[in-house]
Every structure is written in structure tokens, then in C-alpha cells.
């Protein structure tokens, strides 16, 4: 029975504080995946309460004589008018989670899963492990390589992550505190202690709290979800995943297609598309009602009873509850309050309005917190390990620290790897310039997503100045590097465009290698100066042809060695003049011919021999013919062979590029596997039962069987062994054959549970009626376990 009208039903307890507050009225709203808020109207005999001391105090609002209520913290307190004895106050009761809505941040989380990120955010606000818990199913939540909170409150960030993953949260209350519960399936929602009967509101007061109004509405929702993404590490793989309705569903084909789907593995994409479809379908069937049962709380299952429409007498998940209470009997005098006069037809007592969904519809929070967008580009500084000036991976990606990042330590853990844009990029060809540690870079974001940064260029600033002072050298275009490690050297290409001083300057700190596969043609319009400070090596593997139109002046400050494999031909227009400081030695293997048109003279030692048109003249102190003696001996030829030049560095040609992936238009839909779950032939015990599907021991998906106890899903490539577990305790093992469509008649009967042999003993004890088979099949372990009779 309800308490008498002159008794107070509602009260407020404030921890560690003595007060005489009485609750005059309250209005509150609480919903799944949202912080609750209760606005309270209070009265007190004291008009001098320390309002500042009341702020942030834990408090418990009691809603019924049985002690049920809502626990939170006082986030607002205000004093109103005073009467002869009572003073009015207004207060707001919210969870500790609400404080996160007042804190905004910009920070980076790396290599953490969503539950781990949520835990860090909560514990950063003093909401420790005893004040929150995760009740998650077997679905794995992979670590996010890079997750950014950007220009959003901590509450919005936490809510967004939950919405993206399909995780919901609700609060559970006690007089000592409130606990934040995260879940991803229906098992995390508790059931209210007792059913609540439906009694149509006829203006009469029931003996017990009841549901006075209850209505159901169906809405059209998307029936199919498709997600697509791109992974630069797997560019040839089309990243697409889809999830659709059960076969045979009578509904229009309404597709929700989105790119990017934010996944790099198809299994992850399939999971996200499944969760997205569940989000669309979560409220396609929705109930709204009104009751005076104060135990109704969002995130709890309501058991409805006594409704004339029998199928509605079932479990309903309360997704939103609006609470309202008034007890004007606490007033012993008139003060300025709307509650004293009442509003509308509600003047005293408690009532609520609620929204609910069927227990079989998986609740997924709607996407109310979109991912923040970065408008335009940002600047950052390239980072790396201590002492390192170039830090990159195999793709030329770098790490940076943004100027808004307060937690970064300017090392190799400040960010994810950022791809670096190039003005040209192909398969083993294009342009590469790795930004170095300490450089300021311009960072863009794919589709404005702060989780997908990439470097688009580098910037100079007052410390990192340009190679040549500006604007004095504004006509110079420069590409200049710095030697690694340690600096002190550089390579440079400089182009000067100033009129009359045009120049291309090249500096190689060490080696210069050229590879020209065909011709090289060089024209020098004026002079050419070559200075080689070491040895010079040249090799011509064919002819060398050279023409000098003026004098050629060659000075050798050491020996000259010339080796000619065949003949040496010299043609001199006027004269040849050779002077040797010591010796000239001519030697021929066969003959030496010296020919002169007019005169030939041999001179040495004061003697000479001259041949001219006048005859042969021999002149010397003594001319001896056949008088013995020996000829002079020359030093001989000792020509040294040249060393071979070293080869220039080689480089390989690039490969053919991978083109865009052609789309298959009108492609036949993916065939589905359909299993009818039944422990016995003809017994549909799994109708509308939640199930979980495992492939080769790994969890893949979950859902609800149809009215006939059947489930359908896309076969997974390479997966042959499936296990299906239903909520009523049954488990089914399925081993796939190579061609599931090519089954013989006996195979199809075997899949339905029939066998082609006669059992020595009955497989089950005969039951008295067909319904008994279904009843026992739906309660494994509860059936008769007596030994069957032959």
C-alpha cells in the first residue's frame, strides 16, 4: 500500500553534513549512455546555510519508503525566498560523470583499446576502479594505434568512443554511492526486482505502483549497412564489409553506406557494420509509457504483466525515464513556489514517463557525438629518439609533436607514424625527402580526421632559417642538405636567376656519380675549367674523337706513358720539335725509316752525318768503317698501363603502378549459410534465442535466431569449423564440407538431426505430448534423466 498522503515520501541525504532539508519537488531525467540530472526544490528552517560547502557534496535522493533512490553529487545550489519559518532552495543532483562535461582537452592516446582509454579518462577525474566497471561480452576490442581527443570535452570524447564501438553505459545506485557500468550486450542490464502490472489509468488509485499507460510504435530503419576503407599497406585489397537482414525479411532494402569505415581488417569491418545495423534497429520497435513505480530506472529491464495484449507481457529495456515528484505537505506556510499551487493535473505524489525497447533488440547508443574535424592544417615539430636527427620507418613516415600536445616528451613516442606527401611517388621511383628531427612541418588530416594526420610540407621559422638570407637572395632556388650524422657537410643544388648572374651551382660533399644509359652532349658557350685534386681515370670502350680549333697546351710535371695497341699516326702541319733532357730511344721490331724531303742530319759528340741533294757528308775527328766496337744501347720502353676507373653507383628501374580497383556492378549477393538449431528433429527450441557464433574457436558475431530457430550468416573464407551457442544453454558444432550447396538428400537429413541407423536404445524417453519435447529442449538438464527403456 502507498503511504498516507500526509506523510513525506521523498527525502535527501547529504553525506558528512547535517541539515534539515525537506524535498518539496523534483524533476529528473536519466537515460542509457547519458548522465542523469535531477532538479530539486528544497525547503529548510535555516536561512544561513553555507551554500559553498554544500556544492559537490555526495547526496542520495530517496524516491520511495522502501529506500530506493538516486545517488549523485550536488553540482548546483541556490537559495531563494524566505517565509516566516521556511526558506526555499534549489539544487541539482548529477553523477560524477557530469563533471567530465566541464573539462575539455587535446591529447593523444596510443596503442590502447577503447576500454583502456575510458579507464584512463575516468581515473584522471578521480573515478577509480571501485566506481566503474566493464561488463563486456567476448567481443575483442583491438588497441587503437592512435586516438586523439581534439577540442572536445572529456565527456563528449568518452561518449564518442562508446558510440563508435557500440558500448553503452548506465548507473547503478545505492545509498552509499553510484557505479558507472559499461556493457556491450543485454546481459549487463539488471532486471527490476518485481514485475509491474499494467492497469489502465481510470483516475483511481491502485494499491501498488502500476504502469498506467503503455503504447508501442514501429519505425522504418535502415536494413543494411556497408562500410569501406583503404589501407595503404594493403593497397590491392578492397576493404569492404557489409551486414544485412536475415534472409526472407519483409522490408525494403535501405542501405547505410559510409567511407571511411575506420578498419584495416575485414573481420573488424564486419564487426563494425554489424554494430551499426544494430544501432539502426535498436529503436525500430519502441514503447512509451507512464507509471507511478519509483523503482523504474534506465538501464534496467522492466517485466510488464497483466497487459491485455499478451506478447507485450515481456521484458522491456528502459532506455529513458523522466521522474517527477511533489509533496506540498512539507510546506507549513506559503512561500513563492510553483509546487505549492501544483502544475496541471499533477499536484502530489510521484510519476514517471519512460521509453523502452524489447529485450531482444540489442541496445546501441546513437551517434550523437560526431568525430571532431580539424579545419585546415596544423604545424608540428618532427621528433625522434635522443641523439637522432633522422627518424623514419620503411615507408618514410615520421613522428611529430603538435604544439597543442601538453603530454608529449619530444621523443619517438609523441605520435603515430605520419605519412609524408611527395610531389611525385611511384613504384620505386619518385621523390623522397624525409623531414628531419627538429623541422617544423605542415600537417594535414584526411577528411579532417585528427586520427589520420599526414605531413604535407616543411616550414622555416626564426631559428630554422633559409639557406641564404632573404630578400637579398630572392632569385635563388635552393635544395640543400645536411650531412648525417653530426652535420658539418652538405650537398646542394642552387639555381640563380638574377639577370646577368644566372647560375646552376652543384656541391657534392663527397662523391658524384652519374649513369647515362645513352648519349651525353655538353656545350659550353665560353670557358671550361676542370680541377681534379686527385687522380683522374677515364675509359673509352670505343673510339675517342677530339678536335681542338686552337692551340693545345699540355704540361706534364711527371712522366707520360702512352701504350698504343696498333699503329700510332702523327700528322704535323709544320714542324715537330722534341727535346729530351737525357735520351731519346727509337726501337722497331722490323725496321725504322727516317725520311726527309731535303735534308737529314744526325749529330752527336761533335760529329755529324748529313744527307742532302749534294750527297752524304760525314764529319768527325775520325771516320771508322768496319773497325769493330759496338752500338750505343737505349734505355728501352717501360710504359705503365693505366688503372681502370671505378663504376658509378647503379640504380634499378621502377615498376608498373597498381591502378584503381574496378568496381563490380551488379555483383550477385553473398550466399548465406543457414542453420536450423534444434536438439531434436522438428523441435524449434531456439526461436528468438540470442546466439553467439564462433569460427575455429574465435568469436565472430552474435545475433538472435528467427521465429523458426534458424540463423544465417556469410561463410568466412577458409573457416570450416563453426560453433553456435544459444542463450538457453545449447551448443552446436558444425563441420563444413568443401561445397555446402552440393549436399545429397541423406546429408540434408543428417544436418536436420536424423540418422539412417536403428538405435539399440531410444534416444529419448517418450513424452506424453508434443509440447513436452519443446519444453524439455528449451531447458537442457531439467528434462527427465531416467534410463530409457528398450
Swiss-Prot record:
Pfam families linked to this entry: Gp5_trimer_C, Phage_base_V, Phage_GPD
Gene Ontology cellular-component annotations: extracellular region; type VI protein secretion system complex
Similarity remark: Belongs to the VgrG protein family.
Consequences of knocking out this gene: Deletion leads to a complete loss of PldA, PldB and VgrG4b secretion.
GO process terms (BP): protein secretion by the type VI secretion system
Gene3D superfamilies: 2.30.110.50, 4.10.220.110, Baseplate protein-like domains, Gp5 N-terminal domain
Organism: Pseudomonas aeruginosa (strain ATCC 15692 / DSM 22644 / CIP 104116 / JCM 14847 / LMG 12228 / 1C / PRS 101 / PAO1)
InterPro entries the record matches: Gp5/Vgr_OB, Gp5_Vgr_C, T6SS_RhsGE_Vgr_subset, T6SS_Vgr_RhsGE, T6SS_VgrG/RHS, Vgr_OB-fold_dom_sf
Name of the featured protein: Type VI secretion system spike protein VgrG5
Keywords of this entry: Secreted
Location within or outside the cell: Secreted
